[in-house]
Amino acid sequence: MLENKLGITDSAELARIEEKISKQKAVEMFENGYLESLEAGTYESLAMIHKYLFDEIYDFAGEIRKVNISKVNFRFAPLMYLDAALQSIDKMPQSTFDEIVEKYVEMNVAHPFREGNGRSTRIWLDLMLKKEIGYVVDWSKVDKEDYLLAMERSPIKDIEIKFLLKNALTDNVNDREIYMKGIDHSYYYEGYYVYKTEEL
């Protein structure tokens, strides 16, 4: 159970409130042009996305985590190497689809935040794709289990995640419906599906 600004002590309630507020913020940053104002592909822009999404809920929004974290069979970058990893990721090229996905995979391994990494990093990925090559991922075309498996394997073999994402690319980069559905699917991958973004 994470400490939060709202004083919520029930984990199920926190999950619901976190989903609702951060989805509202995701819509807001799309509609008010905030996303467009960010530089694509930097840790700083990812931290700003994370802070925008979660600042009403967590004190650590936009801040580098202070603990080591892992998920099931996956250990993320150890704390002692995290700063160096983020500096290295910032320097990675991002001019082609393959380079952008490779950068995304490395940022996922870094997992710089205590919570909310996947949701903020997928928005960050789309910002890179949009600004660099004129595409975004239509996440509604990316199966949850296929995606999670591909991401789990991606540090060793990234061909699967590249294949999945390439097949879901669209040049409708400013389409509100694609963005809204994308947020819903992105949250669904993490187990959040109480609210539909378009209804908030």
What is each of the regions a protein language model found here?
Residues 1-200:
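FIC/Doc superfamily catalytic core
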